[in-house]
Amino acid sequence: MGTAKQNQNRKKFTREYKVKEIQRSITKKTRLRKEYLKALKDEGYAVPEKEPKTVAKESVRKIKEARAIEGKKKLDEKKEIKKQRKRMQKDELNKQRNEQLERIRVSKEKFQRREDRKKKLTQRTRTGQPLMGPKIEDLLDKIKTDDTYTS
């Protein structure tokens, strides 16, 4: 625990205590300055005006603002590059997906044509004999589509 004096000393090293001390110091300095300026005015002396901001301070401020703006621009550029990358990846995925869907559609159509052709070629009469009409049509189609027979 400790004595009251020890507790008081411990409080001096806390953040809150230091903040209060700084605030007290600032208010004391402003009060003293105000009283001093008032006394000067009462005695008839010229009261010094507030010092204009020096060029160095302004240039430092301008440099800081320029750096902040530059940093913001760089950040915006990075964000834009990220957006473009995401957009490109999304477009690439959509393109791949569309190509895959197209391949699936083509293979289904090809399978359906094969099934239809097989069905036509395996048709039979009532007595079980194969029909020759569809077979002849199929051969004729093959001849028409083959490049060796057409010039």
From Swiss-Prot:
Keywords: Coiled coil, Nucleus, rRNA processing. InterPro entries: Fyv7/TAP26, Fyv7_fungi. It is found in: Nucleus, Nucleolus. One of its GO terms (cellular component) is nucleolus. It comes from the Eukaryota. Residues 70-113 form a coiled coil. Residues 76-151 are annotated as: Disordered. Residues 89-115, 135-151 have a biased composition (Basic and acidic residues). One of its GO terms (biological process) is maturation of SSU-rRNA. Belongs to the FYV7 family. Present with 1460 molecules/cell in log phase SD medium. Involved in the processing of the 20S pre-rRNA. Required for survival upon K1 Killer toxin exposure. This is rRNA-processing protein FYV7. It comes from Saccharomyces cerevisiae (strain ATCC 204508 / S288c) (Baker's yeast). The lineage of its organism: Eukaryota, Fungi, Dikarya, Ascomycota, Saccharomycotina.
